Regions:
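Structural signature of the Rossmann-like NAD(P)-dependent dehydrogenase/reductase core
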Residues: 53-54, 128, 178-187, 226-231
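Conserved glycine-rich Rossmann-like NAD(P)H-binding loop of the short-chain dehydrogenase/reductase
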Residues: 71-86
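Catalytic loop of short-chain dehydrogenase/reductase
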Residues: 132-133, 139-153, 172-221
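Rossmann-fold cofactor-recognition segment
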Residues: 92-109
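C-terminal helical subdomain
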Residues: 222, 229, 237, 241-285
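Conserved glycine-rich cofactor-binding loop
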Residues: 57
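Conserved Rossmann-fold cofactor-binding substructure of NAD(P)-dependent oxidoreductases
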Residues: 106-120
């Protein structure tokens, strides 16, 4: 199983531009641009702690790792094969506060092994980022690849729950006690009301992730743990802008992660169980 970071909010296949137009037309303020003033400086004001990021080999996950490490946090970056991720290895060589760990979020033995290695280590922030779009292959009605449904559900929805259940004790021992999942507006019932076509398996997996995190927020409330889903926006992790390819609302990965870090830093008990865009706007479930 190849686990990659969710590289964008919407697919790049033929229905891509239609989906973008529908999203912008129907979501209104939900997809408004820059981070809100209330959260703009939250990350800078938050004392460094320990953060664990899954799916950290590239894209959004790697940018989370880079920014947190540069901000002085103790960072645990996980990937299926971190030793093969050149950018992670090079960053770890420069940053003594960065620890690389092997983790396959769909492999029970891999998760248990990480749980054992991290036993007794408090984690302030757990970011479930690992996920995949499967390049939207076989996700158009009439041409559905039914054998790929289970893959995306296991990786995008079940994987984060596996990891969270294994490490919840570490988070409870941390000071900040925050669990996040990088989701997508593709999994929002409110936004999908605009008629965005195709992408069935990816949408279903992200909708499932949203419900799992919402339910988890209720179960973990008595333990003082905050849980929320994050929408990174339509992120250019593939370098489209550098190649002259533009899409409405496309956002640079650095800006997206800066915004999400601010959201995480400012997350309060009243916001647990919500779906928040990198700009600070609350999204419809």
């Amino acid at each position: 199983v190849t686990a990659v970071e969710p590289s964008q909010e919407l697919p790049m296949n033929p229905f891509r531009r239609i989906a973008v137009a529908a999203l912008l037309a129907t979501a209104g303020a939900v997809v408004a641009g820059a981070p809100q003033p209330a959260v703009a400086q939250a990350a800078a004001a938050t004392p460094p702690g320990t953060v664990l990021v899954t799916g950290a080999s590239r894209g959004i996950g790697f940018e989370f790792v880079r920014q947190y490490a540069e901000a002085g946090w103790s960072v645990i970056a996980t990937a299926r094969k971190p030793q093969d991720a050149k950018n992670l290895v090079e960053l770890a060589a420069r940053r003594r506060n960065l620890r690389l760990e092997a983790l396959d979020v769909v492999d029970a033995a891999s998760i248990t092994a990480l749980q054992q290695r991290l036993a007794g280590l408090p984690i302030d922030v757990l970011i479930n980022n690992a996920g995949d779009t499967d390049q939207f292959r076989g996700q158009s009605f009439g041409k559905l690849a039914h054998d790929r449904f289970g893959y995306l559900m296991e990786l995008n929805a079940h994987g984060p729950m596996r990891v969270t259940e294994a490490l919840v004790g570490n988070v409870e021992a941390g000071r900040q006690k925050k669990i996040l999942a990088v989701s997508s507006l593709a999994g929002s019932f409110g936004v999908q009301g605009g008629g965005m076509p195709g992408g069935y398996w990816y949408k279903a997996s992200k909708a499932a992730l949203n419900m799992l995190m919402l339910s988890l927020s209720q179960d973990l409330k008595p333990r003082g743990i905050l849980v929320a889903c994050l929408s990174p926006g339509q992120v250019d992790t593939q370098g489209y802008a550098a190649r002259g390819i533009t899409m409405p609302g496309m956002v640079d990965v650095k800006l997206s992660v800066e915004g999400m870090r601010n959201v995480i830093a400012g997350l309060a008990p009243a916001q647990s169980g919500t779906f928040i865009r990198y700009s600070g706007d609350v999204q419809p479930w």
